[in-house]
Amino acid sequence: MKMSREEYAELFGPTTGDKIRLGDTDLWIEVEKDFTVYGEEMIFGGGKTIRDGMGQNGRITGKDGALDLVITNVVLLDYTGIVKADVGVKDGRIVGVGKSGNPDIMDGVDPHMVIGAGTEVISGEGKILTAGGVDTHIHFICPQQMEVALSSGVTTLLGGGTGPATGSKATTCTSGAWYMARMLEAAEEFPINVGFLGKGNASDKAPLIEQVEAGAIGLKLHEDWGTTPSAIKTCMEVVDEADIQVAIHTDTINEAGFLENTLDAIGDRVIHTYHIEGAGGGHAPDIMKLASYANILPSSTTPTIPYTVNTMDEHLDMMMVCHHLDAKVPEDVAFSHSRIRAATIAAEDILHDIGAISMTSSDSQAMGRVGEVIIRTWQVADKMKKQRGALAGENGNDNVRAKRYIAKYTINPAITHGLSHEVGSVEKGKLADLVLWDPVFFGVKPELVLKGGMIARAQMGDPNASIPTPEPVFMRQMYASYGKANRSTSITFMSQASIERGVAESLGLEKRISPVKNIRKLSKLDMKLNSALPKIEIDPKTYQVFADGEELSCQPVDYVPLGQRYFLF
């Protein structure tokens, strides 16, 4: 039997060579490989193939290895590739990406992907599946951020804070062992993975070690607490010993030293630099130079991406609020103006496009929007395609660019903070934190958000309706968000030192606990598809940015895709 590509796609989803548009962007991904078998596709429903004795094996039990969940015929968009496959989940983890079914009557079935009577099905035909996002720049200012982030497709939040305290509104630090314990306890209620950064600003190691042993997955150096060369050196010594990450927000006003002094204090040790663009903070005007160094893992935040006609005006007011500045104090106003530079903000988009900035993150409620990491990452990708054209290696599709940009908020932040053994990609063995998208709504409104293999958020209609689809349809909490299910489907990340000291047990934590690890030997070359090391120079008078001698400049846009048209209802 033969059928047209159009007919096949309508029934079973796109196959090798077919293209899918991402939302209302100008980005098109092309299926590189199809792991399903033509004629033996797994389809659920009346008269379909997932029935007893057909695609469903009638003998295999859960103990024998039957899948708990299969997502059928879905297109995976991951840094590893853009492929069509079935995705198998067992005990909350991904056990296979390939062909599912009943090996008794079918060829090519992955032995780890056998469908049995205990297997649930999510139909992925015509849908896109991605890994849950990892946001590494969270100010834990209000718990409602968790709901917004999860509803956007972000499933892991890393950062610091204790609520709307003045320090937390400005810096991503959960300061001290007592607050670390309380935040670990609070995290029990949320169906999302979390990890907390302690305050890294101290000239002695003891208060830093205390926070690491209390559970901190890393330390945060922030200029508002004094990011001096002494504090940097002390912090770096502690994280090297504990195999955790340090995130740094450098000295905007160059009070305790210049960029070169910070580099000397860091040495050749790996560090995650926040706000590489500078608008969010850091050595003015040349913090962006750090993206040239192999031991620097650079990220930027949602406020400045993509560069639009409104970016400059919006930032000045935000700056005054977020950093507790006074518009009546001339020095505070000058501080704000020193950070908002059009030339470096414009260069930020291009550095993302060439893979020199490795990660995107939110800076939640502290200049950034926690629910817009994914939206804004894809808006930059769209803007760069329109302004810079296709990337090398692309032939009639945007696969190279798509894989580069999805890596910025999935695998690369997971690697940077030592979580990639658990999350960050759609790969065998990882927690099944997965996001299912209708291509029309890609990047904006997920259809389903799975945590540890269970649906935590979904687009759902009127609960009193006779079917799930009647209006109003919007993102609602699902069963993985309730009771003890949120504890068994999510992870609290902690330092190895705190785990060995029994902190989780002493606090009575019930969530899965996992250590961060394999951090201190990282380099930028470990950043997937975002490891470029151009020589970056910045004119101190005009703030023009040059990479390998080429000026990086682009125009602000007055329209972005994935924008207001999606939020009319």
UniProtKB/Swiss-Prot annotation:
InterPro entries: Amidohydro-rel (IPR006680), Metal-dep_hydrolase_composite (IPR011059), Metal_Hydrolase (IPR032466), Urease_alpha_N_dom (IPR011612), Urease_alpha_subunit (IPR050112), Urease_AS (IPR017950), Urease_asu (IPR005848), Urease_asu_c (IPR017951). The modification N6-carboxylysine is found at K220. One of its GO terms (biological process) is urea catabolic process. Keywords: Cytoplasm, Hydrolase, Metal-binding, Nickel. One of its GO terms (cellular component) is cytoplasm. CDD domains: Urease_alpha. This is Urease subunit alpha. GO terms for molecular function: nickel cation binding; urease activity. Its main location: cytoplasm. Its EC number is 3.5.1.5. Heterotrimer of UreA (gamma), UreB (beta) and UreC (alpha) subunits. Three heterotrimers associate to form the active enzyme. Belongs to the metallo-dependent hydrolases superfamily. Urease alpha subunit family. Carboxylation allows a single lysine to coordinate two nickel ions. The active site is at H323. It is found in: Cytoplasm. Ni(2+) 2 binds at K220, H249, H275.
